[in-house]
A protein has these predicted regions:
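Conserved, structured core segments of small domains
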Residues: 3-92
């Protein structure tokens, strides 16, 4: 049974890395879009490169599916976000 199948079988959430990218002139729209979206990601620190010119934001979230993970984001942000199933590893 795969790791994802085991997680689903025992009812645990999968871990996803959400990677959002936007243009420099879209920063205001991206951040403002959260004001109209009820999400546990609001008021929570995350990594972003807007202040250094990269205009990307990353979130690590737990969700039941990719769709559930993207639903944590406002539509405008989710449409510009890639999602990757991830897990922790021990680096030797």
């Amino acid at each position: 049974m795969s790791g994802l199948a085991v997680r689903r079988h025992v009812g645990l959430m999968a871990c996803y890395l959400l990677h959002h990218r936007h243009e420099p002139d879209e920063c205001g729209v991206v951040f403002a879009s959260f004001k109209g979206h009820d999400s546990p990601l609001r008021h929570r620190p995350t990594l972003a490169s807007c202040h250094t010119g990269g205009h990307a934001i990353w979130w690590t979230v737990e969700a039941g599916s990719e769709d559930d993970a993207l639903a944590l984001l406002p539509y405008y942000v989710a449409q510009r976000t890639t999602i990757t199933l991830v897990s922790e590893v021990q680096i030797p």
